[in-house]
């Protein structure tokens, strides 16, 4: 592909989890379609190393790892590793010469953001979670523009923070306007525990299905995560119920999964919460209890407080109380419809365009 040397250039920093990478990819595609040169900064051992090239973008790697809670020796070595990674990022920036840098979380964002500001390049930060990560908390003090998905995420004296929502794929935003909910022959339950799955959901759901199938018609599509396929299938088979269950290690086509589902049982990562709002689906949210600063519980509150989801903390999750919640949906299809509408009410559907335009505006001024 021929590269226009006069095209505006952006360096995007996002990695580690899908909650960082997929929103950043949405912005990258938006800008690329407008003729921008997009380059990525990440780490070689995290998911961005695989996903970003698959979507057609060049990626550079720096050597950086998380330092929070990693022991005394790694903590003592951290300053030296951070300085080295900042120098590596400066080399990438000097070679690519971006007009603007977008940080959306992950290990590479810290060194890349510092290197960019040292080079005098505008830095845009986007925080996907309701509670900011440590890297974004620090970078927010030097960023040119701070964006967040949810209100009251940052408290920065003398600096404006703009709430723009979380970028989601265009096809998901469109799906929400077309999706119809109501009475079906069977309640369609989508179970998603993230790319690695959720052990507790893998263990509880087969028992839930066994309970519900005695009196209700239910069908399940269950993403169990890497290396959990055989064990979870065995759990369902041990229940001895003739239930329609599709068990998958990973669901590549989430649009199809959301289109199929009536209700979602899931963790409450920022991207998941934003996608549920965009597609207008009710949910039963089981926050990951070991997330930094318990940010998944705060994320979940966005939907729960809007009447779009139920919160079931992992500490009290049982097959009985999960089955009770799903029975409510199965026996009251009007609840599905109403909660789906409430989810759609909190959706921010133009977040991708907003983030892209803010980056473009700063690039024009630089």
Curated annotation (Swiss-Prot):
Please provide an example of a Pfam family that matches this protein in its UniProt record: Glyco_tran_28_C
Localisation per UniProt entry? Cell inner membrane
Tell me the membrane topology, using the record's own terms.
Peripheral membrane protein
Keyword tRNA-binding carried by entry: no
E.C. number(s) listed in UniProt: 2.4.1.227
Spell out the InterPro entries in the cross-references.
GlcNAc_MurG, Glyco_trans_28_C, GlycoTrans_28_N
Q: Name one GO molecular function term.
A: UDP-N-acetyl-D-glucosamine:N-acetylmuramoyl-L-alanyl-D-glutamyl-meso-2,6-diaminopimelyl-D-alanyl-D-alanine-diphosphoundecaprenol 4-beta-N-acetylglucosaminlytransferase activity
Where primarily located?
A: membrane
Matching entries from NCBIfam families are given as: murG (TIGR01133)
UniProt protein name: UDP-N-acetylglucosamine--N-acetylmuramyl-(pentapeptide) pyrophosphoryl-undecaprenol N-acetylglucosamine transferase
Q: Name the source organism.
A: Shewanella denitrificans (strain OS217 / ATCC BAA-1090 / DSM 15013)
């Amino acid at each position: 592909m021929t590269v226009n040397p006069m095209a505006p250039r952006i360096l995007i920093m996002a990695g580690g989890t899908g909650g960082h990478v997929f929103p950043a990819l949405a912005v990258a595609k938006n800008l690329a379609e407008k003729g921008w040169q997009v380059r990525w900064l990440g780490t070689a051992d995290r998911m961005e190393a695989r996903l970003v090239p698959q979507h057609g973008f060049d990626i550079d790697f720096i050597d950086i790892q998380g330092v929070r809670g990693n022991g005394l020796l790694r903590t003592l070595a951290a300053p030296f590793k951070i300085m080295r990674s900042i120098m590596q990022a400066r080399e990438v920036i000097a070679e690519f010469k971006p007009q603007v840098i977008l940080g959306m979380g992950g290990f590479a964002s810290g060194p890349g953001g510092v290197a960019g500001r040292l080079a005098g390049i505008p830095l845009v930060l986007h925080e996907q979670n309701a509670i900011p990560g440590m890297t974004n908390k620090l970078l927010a003090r030097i960023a040119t523009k701070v964006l967040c998905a949810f209100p009251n995420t940052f408290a920065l004296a003398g600096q404006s923070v703009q709430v723009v929502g979380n970028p989601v794929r265009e096809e998901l935003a469109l799906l929400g306007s077309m999706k119809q909910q109501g009475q079906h022959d069977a309640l369609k339950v989508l179970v998603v525990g993230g790319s690695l799955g959720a052990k507790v959901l893998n263990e509880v759901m087969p028992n839930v299905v066994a309970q519900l199938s005695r009196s209700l018609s239910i069908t399940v599509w269950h993403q169990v995560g890497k290396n959990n396929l055989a064990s979870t299938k065995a759990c369902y088979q041990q229940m001895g119920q003739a239930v329609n269950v599709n068990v998958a290690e990973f669901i590549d086509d989430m649009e199809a999964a959301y289109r199929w589902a009536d209700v979602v049982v899931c963790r409450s990562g920022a991207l998941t919460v934003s996608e549920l709002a965009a597609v207008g689906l009710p949910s039963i949210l089981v926050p990951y209890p070991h997330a930094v600063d318990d940010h998944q519980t705060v994320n979940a509150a966005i939907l729960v407080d809007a009447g779009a989801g139920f919160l079931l903390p992992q500490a009290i999750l049982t097959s009985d109380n999960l089955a009770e919640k799903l029975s409510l949906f199965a026996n009251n299809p009007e609840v599905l419809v109403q909660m789906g509408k409430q989810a759609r009410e909190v959706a921010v559907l133009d977040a991708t365009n907003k983030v892209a335009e803010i980056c473009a505006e700063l690039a024009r001024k630089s």
